[in-house]
A protein has these predicted regions:
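Peripheral interaction segments used for macromolecular assembly
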Residues: 1-150
């Protein structure tokens, strides 16, 4: 699933289909290359985010969460949020690699699969950090043993 597809989806509880809010954004844990939290808008209890562990399922029509998740349970386990979409992308050597256009993630595990940038695709496993200035990725390893070399 893509971040752009998840944005705006209703977030509902599993047991009684109560609407908790809408997906405003997804928080990335760059160290683990996973979605760490679902940022909410329009939540009646003013919950700002729910940890990914509270998510039961992500589909094309809604995000389903455990029914007993509360604001207090969620906030302690949610890392600082930095918007990933639109973020500048730099390698660990400072080489620019465009901006993040979208991100593919596994809707079950939350694992980041691919960053789609203005200059091409980057494997999620290469993500090293995400801050207010940029997303930092590992540079691609240099090719060795090129054709024609000894």
């Amino acid at each position: 699933m893509l971040f752009s597809q998840a944005l705006g989806l209703p977030v509902i509880t599993a047991d009684d289909a109560t609407t908790v809010g809408k997906v405003a954004d997804l928080t990335v844990d760059a160290h683990d290359a996973t979605v760490a939290a679902v940022r909410l808008s329009g939540a009646a209890d003013r919950t700002e985010a729910l940890p990914w562990s509270a998510v039961e399922a992500v589909g094309t029509d809604a995000v389903i969460v455990h029914s007993r998740v509360t604001a207090e349970q969620g906030q302690d386990r949610v890392p600082a949020h930095h918007r990933a979409l639109g973020s500048r992308v730099l390698t660990e050597h400072g080489v620019e690699h465009g901006t993040v256009r979208d991100i593919a993630f596994d809707p079950v595990s939350g694992r980041i699969l691919t960053l789609y940038t203005a200059l091409g695709e980057i494997a999620g496993a290469r993500l090293m950090g995400l801050g207010s200035y940029a997303a930092v990725v590992r540079a691609e390893p240099a090719l060795t043993g090129a054709v024609g070399s000894p």
